[in-house]
Amino acid sequence: MLLSLVQRIASMLLLVTISGLLPACNSSGGDAQPQIPLAAVNEQLILTDQQNSALRFDNGAITIRGGVRGIIVVRQNASSYLAFERNCPYQPLDTCSRVKVEPFLRLYDPCCKSQFSFTGQPEAGPATLPLRRYSTALSGNLLTITN
């Protein structure tokens, strides 16, 4: 009987200890942000099309359909392009969470006031995570964007 009581107490202590440790497993320190939903991305741009004319210059950027809330395409140089999800990583589930392009200056979310560099890194505002980046492949004048 005493052994049974000791086993019960030990089981309860183990349960309490495990329960107390679980919140400590949250690496974000309690500031967990919801994740941007996943969406299949497979887009192609013809860089010589007039609608893509901003991509003829370094740091030129355009927005296109695709992804969760759209895709931002940025030209780094003639042979290097970056593509990002327009859904802001700060509060991605807010209906107004959509990053916009201020030509040749910055990327910004008017909803939460976060600002991002043309490499997708947060520069100002509450966002601490970079924009979700998609893969790009250039073949002649055809830019393919995938995830």
Model-identified regions with their sequence ranges:
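Eukaryotic intrinsically disordered, low-complexity regions
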Residues: A10-L14, C25, G30
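N-terminal pre-ligand scaffold of iron-sulfur
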Residues: S27-F104, Q115-S117, R132-N147
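Bacterial N-terminal signal peptides that target proteins for export
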Residues: M1-L13
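Residue-level recognition of alpha-helix boundary/capping or hinge positions
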Residues: M1, L55, R106-Y108, P122, ...
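C-terminal motif of bacterial Sec signal peptides marking the signal peptidase cleavage site
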Residues: G20-A24
